[in-house]
Amino acid sequence: MFNRIISLFLLLFTGQVIALDLELTQGINSALPIAINSFGSDAAAQEIGNVIENDLTISGQFKIISGPQGANSQSSVSTLRQLGADSVVTGRVNQVGNRIEVSFTLADAVANGNILLTKTFQINANQVRALAHHISDEVYQKLTGERGIFSTRIAYISVQRAGGRSRYSLEVADADGHNPQSLLVSSEPIMSPSWSPNGKSISYVSFEKKKAEIFTVSVETGQRRLITSFPGINGAPAWSPDGQHLAVVLSKSGTPKIYDVDLSSGSMKQLTFGNSIDTEPRYSPDGRSLLFTSGRGGSPQVYRLSLADGQISRVTFEGNYNARASYTPDMKHIVMLHREDRQFNIGVQNTGGGPISNLTFSGLDESPSVSPNSRLVLYATRYQDRGVLGIVSIDGRIRMRLPAREGDVQEPAWSPYLS
């Protein structure tokens, strides 16, 4: 498995996704009870209500309370309070010329319906889902005090197989998996997507010329830039927090090692040395260190490289396989791929050390990517013999599966905040 991960350029991934459907597999009793009143009967109004419900469910922080008439119905705040709701979102949608006017109110059902938040927006018809995600962010922040992640995006690799041929694509979608767009399509493998800190570009590995090359691509324009194209391995690109550098894995001098590429000048600096294979670099959010996977201790483990003095220290000691590690944005935890008893699951460890706790338990999990608010981990897994995406909370109490309607989905990457 270690060779399979460190030699990313050899992998042939399969999968294709059109949209993702939320399926909650585990929840918590402490979720905040909230009701979403219908925004209206037309398609736009129904979509807004559905998106908000879906978003708040994905967060793991809310329990949706339905009115007497079920979802997408209109009930009084007092009625919804009797059904257990602590908060109520109410809205309306009106046509104003060629624009759509959307208003919403967040009320405290416990405090006699006191208004906590109310806003009105005018949008174009193609902005309905985006506005619904924005409303979810507003509601989430008002009730939790933390910034919402519903207007962020995810990237992933998908492959469609037909007639003995494969079609690889780099997809970008909303955080809930809807609104997928193909940035790149190729008959050769694409892998290792990684978002730039400003969310405007994605780095990735391409085999379109029958060899591994590292590119960046603009999410808005699709314009590409070739970063490295050396003989052998060009893999595992990861952005520095300031967006000025990429850490990459190159084997141009023999054994795969980690290099820093200055994106302005193109100059490179080798960061790791020796005879061991070093791979999967990830910058710390403060830019002071790198996490990476290495076999220098005899088995694949996670190490930390200080960028100030080049000192390397081992991070993981539990088990004989830990890889693909990254910090949560708040730097409180390290999320990784952890193997025990031949089962590959997503694990988490406190940044200061200590035991590794499993967040998932399917034994077929990989490619963890942390949400920008540090609360959720997006990962790839298998379900009913297909590649799908899963989400697990950083404390392991919330687990969700987002099965694709068609094909497989793999190598997800969660964007940073986009505004």
UniProtKB/Swiss-Prot annotation:
One record GO biological process: protein import
Subunit structure: The Tol-Pal system is composed of five core proteins: the inner membrane proteins TolA, TolQ and TolR, the periplasmic protein TolB and the outer membrane protein Pal. They form a network linking the inner and outer membranes and the peptidoglycan layer.
Stored HAMAP family: TolB (MF_00671)
Organism: Legionella pneumophila (strain Lens)
Function: Part of the Tol-Pal system, which plays a role in outer membrane invagination during cell division and is important for maintaining outer membrane integrity.
Pfam families (alphabetical): PD40 (PF07676), TolB_N (PF04052)
Protein name per Swiss-Prot or TrEMBL: Tol-Pal system protein TolB
Record's keyword annotation contains Cell division: yes
Subcellular location: Periplasm
Family of the protein in this entry: Belongs to the TolB family.
Signal peptide range in chain numbering: 1-19
Alphabetic keyword roster: Cell cycle, Cell division, Periplasm, Signal
Example of a GO cellular component annotation carried by this entry: periplasmic space
NCBIfam families according to UniProt: propeller_TolB
Taxonomic superkingdom: Bacteria
InterPro entries, alphabetized: 6-blade_b-propeller_TolB-like, PD40, Tol-Pal_TolB, TolB_N
Keyword Signal appears in the UniProt entry: yes
